[in-house]
């Protein structure tokens, strides 16, 4: 798959919205049940920009969004600065082509460049592809929480994975 990874722009929001709403309606990757509108994604985009956090997109030669990735604060308390939670979503017809790896690798590089310390992934425990992707890039399972969510008429379990971006770094 020939795709370029780049910073997202406002023009990418309709493509991001379509991928997001597909995940809402058809997967357990997002635990929301109600699709969102473009204003919601614009507010999310603006919030990431204010916080200095990236939104990356994988796009084809025509600029069409094939996937996206981002991170934001893990928790809103000062003691968690340096730790972010990330998301990676790939368009349904593009899954299994390596875009998730490309997006997550680029996101890890960006987090390291920003001097962050830990990246956290919160993954529905049945999502073997996402767990495998994260393991491949060095993430380790750090916890599991059974039946903490629900969607599609069933309980969902949550697996936490994390990557220490600089294990030799001293505490501040």
UniProtKB/Swiss-Prot annotation:
<dbReference type="InterPro" id="IPR016181">
    <property type="entry name" value="Acyl_CoA_acyltransferase"/>
</dbReference>
<feature type="binding site">
    <location>
        <begin position="85"/>
        <end position="87"/>
    </location>
    <ligand>
        <name>substrate</name>
    </ligand>
</feature>
<feature type="binding site">
    <location>
        <begin position="75"/>
        <end position="77"/>
    </location>
    <ligand>
        <name>substrate</name>
    </ligand>
</feature>
<feature type="binding site">
    <location>
        <begin position="88"/>
        <end position="90"/>
    </location>
    <ligand>
        <name>acetyl-CoA</name>
    </ligand>
</feature>
<keyword id="KW-0808">Transferase</keyword>
<comment type="subunit">
    <text>Homodimer.</text>
</comment>
<comment type="function">
    <text>Plays a role in the resistance against the toxic effects of L-methionine sulfoximine (MSX), a rare amino acid, which inhibits glutamine synthetase (GlnA). Catalyzes the acetylation of L-methionine sulfoximine (MSX). It can also use L-methionine sulfone (MSO).</text>
</comment>
<dbReference type="InterPro" id="IPR000182">
    <property type="entry name" value="GNAT_dom"/>
</dbReference>
<dbReference type="Pfam" id="PF00583">
    <property type="entry name" value="Acetyltransf_1"/>
</dbReference>
<protein>
    <recommendedName>
        <fullName>L-methionine sulfoximine/L-methionine sulfone acetyltransferase</fullName>
        <ecNumber>2.3.1.-</ecNumber>
    </recommendedName>
</protein>
<feature type="binding site">
    <location>
        <position position="127"/>
    </location>
    <ligand>
        <name>acetyl-CoA</name>
    </ligand>
</feature>
<keyword id="KW-0012">Acyltransferase</keyword>
<dbReference type="GO" id="GO:0016747">
    <property type="term" value="F:acyltransferase activity, transferring groups other than amino-acyl groups"/>
</dbReference>
<feature type="domain" description="N-acetyltransferase">
    <location>
        <begin position="3"/>
        <end position="166"/>
    </location>
</feature>
<feature type="binding site">
    <location>
        <begin position="96"/>
        <end position="101"/>
    </location>
    <ligand>
        <name>acetyl-CoA</name>
    </ligand>
</feature>
């Amino acid at each position: 798959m020939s795709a370029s990874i780049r910073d997202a722009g406002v023009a990418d929001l309709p493509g991001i919205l379509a991928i997001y709403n597909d995940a809402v309606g058809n997967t357990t990757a997002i635990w929301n049940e109600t699709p969102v509108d473009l204003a919601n994604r614009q507010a999310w985009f603006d919030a990431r920009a204010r916080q200095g956090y990236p939104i990356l997109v994988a796009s084809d030669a025509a600029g069409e969004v094939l996937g996206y990735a981002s991170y934001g604060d893990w928790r809103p308390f000062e003691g968690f600065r340096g730790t972010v939670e990330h998301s990676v979503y790939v368009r349904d017809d593009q899954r299994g082509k390596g875009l998730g790896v490309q997006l997550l690798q680029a996101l890890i590089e960006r987090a390291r460049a920003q001097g962050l310390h830990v990246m956290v992934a919160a993954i529905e425990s049945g999502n073997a592809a996402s767990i495998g992707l994260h393991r491949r890039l060095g993430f380790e399972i750090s916890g599991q929480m059974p039946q903490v969510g629900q969607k599609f008429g069933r309980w969902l379990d949550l697996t936490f994975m994390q990557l220490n971006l600089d294990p030799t770094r001293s505490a501040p």
